[in-house]
């Protein structure tokens, strides 16, 4: 009876790819395997976007300035950030995840949550399925990953972080609090520097300390989540990239922006969601960071519409010789359907749906670079 009750409550597998960008480079060039690979920050410019575990032994980590990474690891292999290549591998990873569940939610380009509830009839117990998924990703793609499995999304995320690299941590039903109590609060998703300062002022150092403050714990830990089966759309879908070298001109920035938009649009359609709010993130070379948002009259999940909005936001916030080092695009206020729209826009939306269904099908079958719109990136090809 206990086993049946546990199965009824829901299971969440959080998959987190290990040093994803660097691992992809090692797959594409096997001579790099076992060597310190550093993505981004070439020639001491820009920042590191990914470092293999061999490079991390020297203290190199993502978001580190390239010149500092070079000092720490002079023999490191520096490679440029190839966002579209990593996006293609990301799609391959998620295609594997979707073989095991219709409920797969992308957290980022290299992280996803697989709802394994009820899949035991096809694949066996969730723990066995989790192990099989990790092995399949490595066997088919050559990429290492880590995972956490529990009946809470938050617990699974934390478990996946602790499992790195190439590990799987299973948290049995009923043992979630025991698992969490000794852990540092920084491991909780969403706890950044500001929240950490707040916790420090309240002498909250461990998750156990946080659990003693129910009013705060309820905001950051949702351990009763497994008992609720409704699909939530209160998250956002986004991507950002640190540029290998700062950009000042609009056209190359728009080319980068289009790559980000395609990934966001693809993920929205994959999750069958629409976004009513779009946000552009810009970080300048002086590390000033701004975010500009636009609420849409009607939700969208189409690349062209998303690009038109965020490129307008870009044009409004660049110029005067200011160099940009990071760009990001995110979609929020997500919904599945159910809004009223005028007949003429409804017909246009149907034509967009057909167009992007065809585009997504071609990309899924032949790769991300198979087809693209006439954008700043490929007009000059």
Predicted regions and their residues:
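Gly/Gly-Pro- and Ser/Thr-rich, intrinsically disordered tail segments characteristic of DNA damage-repair
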Residues: 1-219, 223, 228, 266, ...
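Short, hydrophobic beta-strand segments
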Residues: 112-118, 291-294, 339-345
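DNA-contacting surface of Y-family translesion DNA polymerases
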Residues: 180, 187, 193-324
């Amino acid at each position: 009876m206990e086993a049946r009750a546990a199965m009824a409550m829901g299971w969440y597998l959080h998959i987190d790819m290990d040093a994803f960008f660097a691992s992809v480079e090692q797959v594409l060039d096997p001579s790099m395997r076992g060597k310190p690979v550093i993505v981004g920050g070439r020639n001491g410019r820009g920042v590191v976007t990914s470092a293999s575990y061999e490079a991390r032994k020297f203290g190199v980590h993502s978001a580190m300035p390239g010149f500092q990474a070079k000092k720490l690891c002079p023999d490191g292999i520096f490679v440029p950030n190839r966002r579209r290549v990593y996006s293609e591998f990301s799609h391959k990873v998620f295609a594997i995840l979707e073989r095991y569940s219709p409920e797969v939610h992308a957290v980022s380009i290299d992280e996803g949550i697989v709802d394994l509830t009820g899949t035991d009839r096809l694949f066996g117990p969730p723990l066995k399925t989790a192990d099989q998924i990790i092995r399949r990703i490595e066997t088919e793609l050559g990429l290492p990953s880590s995972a956490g499995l529990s009946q809470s999304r938050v617990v699974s995320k934390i478990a996946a972080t602790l499992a790195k690299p190439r590990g799987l941590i299973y948290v049995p039903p009923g043992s979630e609090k025991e698992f969490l109590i000794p852990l540092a609060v920084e491991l909780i998703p969403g706890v950044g520097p500001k929240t950490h300062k707040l916790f420090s002022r309240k002498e909250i150092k461990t998750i156990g300390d946080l659990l003693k403050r129910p009013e705060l714990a309820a905001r950051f830990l949702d351990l009763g989540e497994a008992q609720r089966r409704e699909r939530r759309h209160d998250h956002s879908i986004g991507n950002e990239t640190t540029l290998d070298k700062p950009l000042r001109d609009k056209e190359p920035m728009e080319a980068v922006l289009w790559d980000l938009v395609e990934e966001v649009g693809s993920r929205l359609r994959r999750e069958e969601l629409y976004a009513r709010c779009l946000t552009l993130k810009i970080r300048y070379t002086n590390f000033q960071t701004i975010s500009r948002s636009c609420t849409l009259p009607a939700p969208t999940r189409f690349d062209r519409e998303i690009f038109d909005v965020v490129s307008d936001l870009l044009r409004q916030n660049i110029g005067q010789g200011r160099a940009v080092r990071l760009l990001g695009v995110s979609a929020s206020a997500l919904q599945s359907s159910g809004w009223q729209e005028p007949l003429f826009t409804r017909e246009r939306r149907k034509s967009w749906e057909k167009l992007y269904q065809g585009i997504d099908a071609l990309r899924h079958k032949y790769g991300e670079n198979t087809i693209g719109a006439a954008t700043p990136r490929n007009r000059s090809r």
